[in-house]
């Protein structure tokens, strides 16, 4: 391995090990805590989910959080047989997406369901529950919203996430998803026109700490960049990065 490459690798590793939470949570539109997954749903899957929502019986969204007075939406109950098919479509699509593994390090996923917001509905500032009463209990590390309505179909309804002193509004194309830490305070702004349909779920990660997940993602991105060089890729660099990734996973994983 050339001296320059070894020095570069050493600097890269030292930079990773020096990173702290403050550097990883700087608030801006490209914040590494927030992951935009494009084209999670295929067009036929999106159409099927919208058709299911059209014919399904929605109930008061407080069924899943009765103690939150600011939750004003509707959802298909997660224990309703009608939730099985859309839940499976959303789950399979998310696990199929190549960026989910790196971004979430998913260990388990709650049963997805569909939520609906009509004009006047919203979900005030809140933080998602830490544990879900499943068997066994599941911890929420990563919150997931899959957008089923195009932004032009409704006004308002932005998912608003607090990042330090900033608030990041998110309103994505139908079929796209956003992942964000379940530890963030967030809200859904009031819908003023149209209908906002979304799929929602939560992920328990093998790596509970968001900063550690981001470091592993940076290492994976570095490996991808090096592998993209093809025959010019430095095998020793790839070996070191792969070793670093695997050993940090062993160190941090709660498996």
Residue ranges and their predicted role:
Residues 27-113, 215-255:
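Non-heme Fe(II)/2-oxoglutarate
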Residues 98-199, 203-217:
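Catalytic core of non-heme Fe(II) oxygenases with the double-stranded beta-helix
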Residues 15-16:
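Mature extracytoplasmic/luminal segments of secretory-pathway proteins
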